[in-house]
């Protein structure tokens, strides 16, 4: 399994309860596919620099999870069909290890 990060932008008219419901259903979607949640964060409502589907702001949700590579396609299909989602992107999470420096 690989580690992925996703940022999903939800429609601004959703209530806090609806955002929480989406987050729970997204976590359930990941775990039912055999994945595991590493971390989650509600980033809140933010204004866009340009309109997306005639909307000026949205509610950002961040999830970090471990899943099989084939799961990403399932996530993308779900995001396209879910009317609460304006945009969603999944990225492969790469851990960068600091290199030790020697002092002369």
Swiss-Prot record:
InterPro entries: Ribosomal_bS6, Ribosomal_bS6_sf, Ribosomal_S6_plastid/chlpt, Transl_elong_EF1B/ribsomal_bS6. Pfam families: Ribosomal_S6. GO terms for biological process: translation. One of its GO terms (cellular component) is ribonucleoprotein complex. GO terms for molecular function: small ribosomal subunit rRNA binding; structural constituent of ribosome. Keywords: Ribonucleoprotein, Ribosomal protein, RNA-binding, rRNA-binding. Belongs to the bacterial ribosomal protein bS6 family. Binds together with bS18 to 16S ribosomal RNA. PANTHER family: MITOCHONDRIAL 28S RIBOSOMAL PROTEIN S6, SMALL RIBOSOMAL SUBUNIT PROTEIN BS6M. This is Small ribosomal subunit protein bS6. It comes from Elusimicrobium minutum (strain Pei191).
């Amino acid at each position: 399994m690989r580690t992925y990060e996703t940022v999903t932008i939800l429609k601004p008219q959703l209530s806090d309860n609806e955002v929480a419901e989406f987050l729970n259903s997204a976590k359930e979607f990941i775990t039912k596919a055999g994945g595991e949640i590493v971390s989650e964060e509600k980033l809140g409502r933010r204004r866009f620099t340009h309109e997306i589907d005639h909307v000026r702001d949205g509610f950002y949700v961040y999830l970090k999870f471990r899943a099989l590579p084939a799961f990403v396609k399932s996530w993308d299909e779900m995001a396209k069909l879910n009317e609460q989602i304006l945009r969603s992107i999944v990225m492969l999470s790469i851990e960068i290890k600091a290199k030790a420096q020697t002092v002369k």
